[in-house]
């Protein structure tokens, strides 16, 4: 047992040393903010306020859709969507990113995560209320769409609606 413990300790030390050296290497690769700004296209800098202004409606959408599912999903016995499965903000921890790049990564991780979260909530809502495919093909349907009934299949709709609703239950 002692030999196994020593080996585990050595492996732990090696992992710690590796992570420390990797972090140092990443820090050396980080571009300074002044250099980053000098090398940025002027339109990137000028458009930043407009891009970042979207955080307000995105945050409101996040809050509103979360409240919607907290209130409505239990009423219809639809399993709630776990927000943390969609909204992941972790890239700011990367040592090779400067402050501006970290803020950009936080924004994009949050915004795209919220949209994916909203898409899953609205996909479950559509499955409950109207699980019918559209007459024309969608470019990128949500994950529930393939289970929907064909457009114009009235008998299939009546038959499949209870089955699809049961599939959403907690």
Question: Model-found features: residue ranges?
Answer:
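Short low-complexity stretches enriched in small and charged residues
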Residues: 23-27, 61-67, 84-88
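Juxtamembrane inter-helical linkers in multi-pass membrane proteins
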Residues: 75-92
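Membrane-proximal intrinsically disordered regions of secretory-pathway and membrane-system proteins
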Residues: 1-40, 87, 93, 106, ...
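Residue-level signal for mature regions of secreted extracellular proteins and peptides
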Residues: 98-101, 123
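A transmembrane-helix-recognition feature enriched in membrane-embedded lipid enzymes
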Residues: 42-79
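N-terminal start-of-chain detector that recognizes signal peptides
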Residues: 78-81, 100-105
């Amino acid at each position: 047992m002692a030999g196994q413990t020593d080996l585990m300790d050595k492996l732990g030390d090696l992992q710690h040393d590796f992570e420390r050296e990797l972090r140092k290497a990443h820090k050396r690769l980080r571009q300074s903010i002044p250099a980053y700004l000098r090398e940025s296209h002027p339109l990137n800098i000028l458009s930043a306020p407009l891009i970042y202004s979207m955080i307000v409606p995105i945050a409101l959408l996040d809050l509103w859709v979360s409240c919607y599912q907290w209130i409505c999903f239990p009423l219809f016995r639809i399993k709630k969507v776990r927000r943390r499965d969609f909204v992941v903000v972790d890239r700011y921890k990367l040592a090779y990113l400067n402050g501006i790049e970290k803020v950009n990564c936080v924004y994009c991780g949050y915004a795209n995560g919220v949209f994916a979260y909203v898409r899953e909530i609205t996909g479950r809502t559509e499955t409950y209320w109207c699980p019918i495919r559209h007459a024309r093909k969608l470019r990128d349907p949500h994950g529930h769409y393939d289970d929907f009934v064909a457009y114009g299949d009235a008998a299939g709709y009546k038959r499949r609606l209870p089955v699809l609703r049961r599939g959403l239950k907690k």
